[in-house]
Design a protein with these regions (language model features):
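A short, aliphatic-rich beta-strand micro-motif
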Residues: 124-134
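Signal-transducing coiled-coil/dimerization helices and immediately adjacent hinge/linker segments
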Residues: 177-252
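The cytosolic transmitter module of two-component sensor histidine kinases
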Residues: 17, 33-37, 85, 157, ...
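Intrinsically disordered, low-complexity terminal regulatory regions
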Residues: 1-72, 234-252
C-alpha cells in the first residue's frame, strides 16, 4: 500500500495525471479563459471514467454562474441548483468543502432538488469541490462532476478530482486576475481620456473644469453614447463633442 492507503500504482497514476495537467495548464494560460477552462475540465475530467458532465461555478456579488462546462446538460444541472439555492455545487462553494453522493435522489438534504435533477437531466451521482483561488476577496468558485450512473465515483476518482481542482483553481485565478487587470486598465484609460478632453475644452472655449465636464456629460446624454467614448474622440481629434457652442453649457 502507498500513502493514505493507496497502492503505489494509484499514487504513480495520480502523479502522472498531475504532471499532465500541469503541462496542459501551462499551455492553456494564454488562451481565451473560457475556452481554456473548458479544455481543462474536458480533458482532465476524462480521468474520472464515469463522469458524464463537468462544470465550473463562480459566486460573485451574491450571484452564481457557470463560467465553463463540457455540455449544455452541465449548465442545466448547475442552473437548477442555483434556482434552489442548494445542491452539491452550491453547498460545496458556500461551505468550503467537498460533496459526494452516489444517488442524489436519496439525499434528504437536497429534496426535492435531487428528484428534479434526475427527472430533467438523468443525474444520479454528483461530486463537487470548492476551488481555492489565490484571491477570494470578490469571487469564490467550485468544480462539479455529475453522472447518470449510481455510485459512479470511486475513492480513486475523488483523488483525481482533487488534483484537477487544484489546476482549475490556478487557471480560474489567472483568468480573474487578467479580467481585473483589464478592467483596471480600461478604467485608467477612460479617466485619462476624460481628463485630456476636459483640458482640450477648457483651452478651446475658456471654460472652467466643471463647465468642460458638463459639456461632455451633456453630449453623452443627448447622443446616448458613453461619456468615455465621446471624451476619447475629443482627446484624439480636438473637436467639440457635438455641434453646439459653449453657450449651451449650463453655467452654475
Amino acid at each position: 500500500m502507498g500513502i493514505n492507503g493507496y497502492r503505489s500504482d494509484d499514487t504513480q497514476a495520480l502523479r502522472a495525471m498531475a504532471d499532465s495537467l500541469a503541462s496542459l495548464t501551462d499551455d492553456l494560460r494564454h488562451e481565451d479563459p473560457e475556452k481554456a477552462l473548458q479544455n481543462l475540465i474536458g480533458r482532465g475530467g476524462q480521468e474520472l471514467v464515469e463522469a458524464r458532465w463537468a462544470s465550473i461555478t463562480v459566486l460573485r456579488g451574491g450571484t452564481f454562474r457557470t463560467i465553463a462546462s463540457t455540455a449544455p446538460t452541465a449548465d442545466g444541472v448547475d442552473r437548477l441548483q442555483y434556482e434552489f439555492g442548494a445542491g452539491p455545487c452550491v453547498d460545496a462553494v458556500l461551505e468550503d468543502t467537498m460533496y459526494l453522493t452516489g444517488d442524489v435522489t436519496a439525499e434528504e438534504r437536497w429534496r426535492p432538488l435531487g428528484e428534479r435533477l434526475s427527472a430533467a437531466y438523468g443525474v444520479r451521482s454528483m461530486l463537487a469541490y470548492r476551488l481555492h483561488l489565490l484571491d477570494e476577496s470578490a469571487t469564490i468558485a467550485g468544480l462539479n462532476f455529475s453522472s447518470d450512473q449510481l455510485d459512479a465515483f470511486s475513492p480513486a476518482d475523488v483523488q483525481r478530482g482533487k488534483v484537477l481542482a487544484t489546476h482549475c483553481a490556478l487557471l480560474v485565478s489567472a483568468s480573474l486576475a487578467r479580467d481585473k487587470a483589464t478592467n483596471l486598465f480600461k478604467a485608467l484609460q477612460s479617466n485619462r481620456e476624460i481628463g485630456v478632453a476636459v483640458g482640450v475644452l477648457m483651452a478651446h472655449h475658456q471654460l472652467t473644469r466643471d463647465q468642460a465636464f458638463d459639456l461632455l456629460r451633456l453630449a453623452s446624454q443627448r447622443t446616448n453614447r458613453k461619456l468615455a467614448d465621446i471624451a476619447g474622440e475629443v482627446a484624439e481629434t480636438g473637436a467639440d463633442p457635438f455641434d453646439f457652442g459653449p453657450e449651451a453649457v449650463p453655467l452654475s
